Amino acid sequence: MLATTHLALINVFTGDIQGGLGPFLGTWLAQTGGWSPARVGFVTTLVGVGALFLSGPAGALVDRIGRPRLLIAAACVAILAGTLLILPAKSFPAVFAAQMVAAAGGVLLLPAITELTLGIVGKDRFPKQQGRNQAYNHLGILIAAGLISFGTAYFGAAVAFWVLGAMAVLAIVATLTTPGHCYNGRRAVGWKEDDPDDKPERATTRSVLSNRKLMVLAVALALFNLGNGGMLTLLGQKLVAAGSDATAWTARYVMVAQLVMIPVALFAGSLADKRGRRKLLLVALAVLPVRAALSAFIDDPLWLISAEILDGVASGIVGVAVPVVVADLTWGSGRTQTALGTVNAVQGIGGALSAWYGGLAQSVLGWSGSFLALGAPALIALALVIWLDTTSEPGRRTQRRERLAASWKPA
């Protein structure tokens, strides 16, 4: 079996488990422990904040150890253990501790899988492979959601644990059976593969994180997530206020967005080389205000599907482009995963504040105004990325034109 096939399987099986039980945690705690929505929301928020603090160190751990297969397997074990510890947990401290174990595994997965991918395919093939990784990731989320949705009717809420456990075990098997000789640690960080005696010093963490372009990118992504993160939640609340079946429609919207993300991720991986990474980011950021406007002025739940299609477009592109751009900006430093973890932490701040920001905007501006307010941060992010005219490497076509222009000499 090819190493890229193992990458596909790893991404399918880790797609759903990265966030642990996710929304099913609240359902389980409410049904078995009688937890109130406020209590569920509080523990979820605390775990989310804790995960933000772990994201940067997780990336640094991947860079330091240089054994991504081991770390992916360890992350899956942590997610599985943290999830299973929820079963006997009844008190707030026990649930929080269990979820933090799962969260630690979750934040480790992205940099570890990125490192493994770079070490297998190299940087030149990374954009296209990252597109495939994300497509399989979204496919895994869809498969898990379908199994849980259908299984709940027959086995109850506990089916979520069985599905997550099975996918975690399969992810571990897919990881540990990946041919070890296909991974090259020097290839993964941008050092010369054919000269093992050449051992460049890793850049200091401070020098990498003081990269202005990297930090501007992180701020732009935080602004994107400030608008994007809470938009579906606010849309569900709008449907409740209108008397619609918000739960059913929200589930449909999630499925639609995930379905759209699969082809978008594949196209984004290909276009990253042909058109350049920056153009992809510009498209993703420009789509969010349009989605916000549709959510603001459309009341029919069926027509609101159009807004969630745009969610799939924007999120699908961001999932592919961000690791690729971070690799561009840090290549050869030996700190790519440290940078990726830090960028994820910064953009996660925007996502954590999004629901609060949307709710505050709704109380002041009403439904239409609140969605427009959620779209506004993306416009600022758009301006930042436009300013970063050399954020990442140009597309292959641009590179080819530049080489031709450089080689042409007038008579």
Regions found by a protein language model. Give the residues of each.
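Symmetry-related core transmembrane helices of the 12-TM Major Facilitator Superfamily/SLC fold
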Residues: 160-177, 371-386
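Interfacial helix-cap and linker-helix signal at transmembrane-aqueous boundaries
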Residues: 29-30, 61-63, 150-155, 239-240, ...
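Structural signature of the two symmetry-related core transmembrane helices
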Residues: 70-84, 279-294
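Helix-loop boundary and gating motifs at the non-cytosolic
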Residues: 1-48, 215-216, 225-242
